[in-house]
Amino acid sequence: MIYVSISTIPARIKNLNQSVQSLLNQTQKPDKIFINIPFKYKRFSETISDDQIPKFDNSIVEITRCEDCGPGTKLLGSLNKFEKNSLVILADDDHIYEDYMIEKFFYFYSKSPNNAY
């Protein structure tokens, strides 16, 4: 399985759609993209309500509401959903990815699955 895990903060929720679309447009498709969004942030007074979260008409994208673990939220928010021995790619919500990014990670992962990149 290939998972992409991402989180966002209130100041960047409006740009999340572009980043996720670039992940959906990959030459090597992920099996699942988890978007981890805390119910409440420890570092910010703002929150993200359900109606602020972009809707993705795609079964690959799953919104995970979770506790805020700071920068670790992008991994820890969905950690219990990963199958063992899977490729997990941590992505940023403010970046548009080249369409070959997942393909390249998968290539190197398949050569050395015990390494981190």
Sequence positions of predicted segments:
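Short, conserved active-site loop motifs that form the nucleotide-linked donor/cofactor pocket
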Residues: I2, S59-V61, N114-N115
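Short, acidic, metal-binding catalytic loop of nucleotide-sugar glycosyltransferases
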Residues: S19-D31, F39-K40, K55
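Conserved donor-nucleotide/metal-binding helix-loop-beta segment in metal-dependent transferases, i.e.
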Residues: Y100-Y117
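N-proximal low-complexity "stem/linker" segments adjacent to membrane-targeting elements
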Residues: M1-N25, F34
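Short beta-strand-to-loop acidic/aromatic patch adjacent to the donor-nucleotide binding site
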Residues: N85-I96
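Eukaryote-skewed repeat-based solenoidal scaffolds used as protein-protein interaction platforms
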Residues: L79-F82, H95, M101
